[in-house]
Amino acid sequence: MELMKRNAVYIFVLISLCLLACSTIGIPNTYGLFYQPLSQILNVGKASATLHVSIAGLATGFSSPLIVKALKKVSCRTVMIIGILMLCLSGYVIGTVQNIMLVNIMGIFRGIGLACTSNVIITILTGNWYKARRGTISGLIMSFSGIMGSLFSPVVSAMLQNYGFRNAYLICAFIMFILALPAVFIPLRPEDVNMEPYGNDRVDIQDKDSYEGYYELSFTGKVFLTLMTTSFLVICVTTLTSYLPSYVESLNQSAQNGAALLSASMVGNVLFKFLIGISIDKKGVFFSFVTFMFISFLGLMVITFIPQNTAMLMVAGVIYGACYAVNKVAVPLTVRIFFGDGKYGEAYSVLSLCENIARSAIITIIGFIYDTSGSYLICFLIALVASLASSALMLYQQKTIKQ
């Protein structure tokens, strides 16, 4: 009976984290569909319409290290509740407001809300609750963000057409709220409820990678800076996702094709996150990083140079989605391997800050490049180079560890 209760708790935590990933990662991945109608409603340029996304990213990044420190003083439940309330407030205001300035202010609230509920919190909870099969479990949880994005993109597109921007945005905010609620009941650590992490008694995971790490954490050291650069290059690739619908429309294809490409990338998001988790458990994080980044590179090549063939474009969208797996599964597990469980929260929160600064800047830069040149080609070419460069840096880091 006791074993059944423990297993039930592990399953509840897993399901709640999957739903949280749907809410705070999956739904925001569909926000690219809102850029065009928002710019039209407020009569502003594409760069101005996406500025609140950049602001939210910066707020998430700067808040994440503070949230990790706050978890030492307040309960995880309190942090979650504050985050969910801020997401609800920002969603309501952005969905009803007529002023771009207020939209940008709400970007700060949304960013803090995401810091309390999104990537950093999800990966910390995953690491605290699951010691065995971390790659597979991390991949499964993060794949649900892709499931939500894949299923929800055409739904959002239909809501925009039938109900308009404001109602569609409010519905999305409400769904985020509902999906995030179960995670409020997850304790920060299983020890807080007199339990042990799943797989804690397995001999095969009592290794240096899982607990101690290979390096001492230094934010100005060569290891962290190289990892930060690698992560930045991956972000250069993943950030294009928000602009896939606009990119397709700029090629004089229908908005439905744009939504379909975004949905296809979310299918790849789901598939490759799950596969990379299994691959990491079997082949290691370095092999998996390089392999899946190259897969994404192939998809991006087709999207960039052969976008006229709709069938090929959709297949390429799926393949391109492998970059999500690298960003959301391989990079966090690399941080854990490098610096160990004890320093993971501190290290990944700072890396997340750097990622969000990069993502925010890149989103705005892409919008600016399009507004000034009328084309997304330069952005896609940069992403192709970044794909190869990130893999080269990861191979370099692997060589350094072996030495």
Regions found by a protein language model. Give the residues of each.
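Extracytoplasmic
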Residues: 12-37, 42-46, 63-67, 152-153, ...
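Extracytoplasmic gate region of multi-pass secondary transporters
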Residues: 31-35, 219-276
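Intracellular juxtamembrane helix-capping segments at the cytosolic ends
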Residues: 38, 116-130, 326-339
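Conserved MFS/SLC helix-loop-helix module at the cytosolic interface between two early adjacent transmembrane helices
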Residues: 62-100
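Helix-to-loop junctions at the C-terminal end of transmembrane segments
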Residues: 63-75, 273-284, 370-371
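Cytoplasmic helix-loop-helix junction between adjacent transmembrane helices
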Residues: 108-143
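A late C-terminal transmembrane helix in Major Facilitator Superfamily
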Residues: 149, 338-373
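C-terminal transmembrane helical hairpin of 12-TM major facilitator-type secondary transporters
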Residues: 280-334
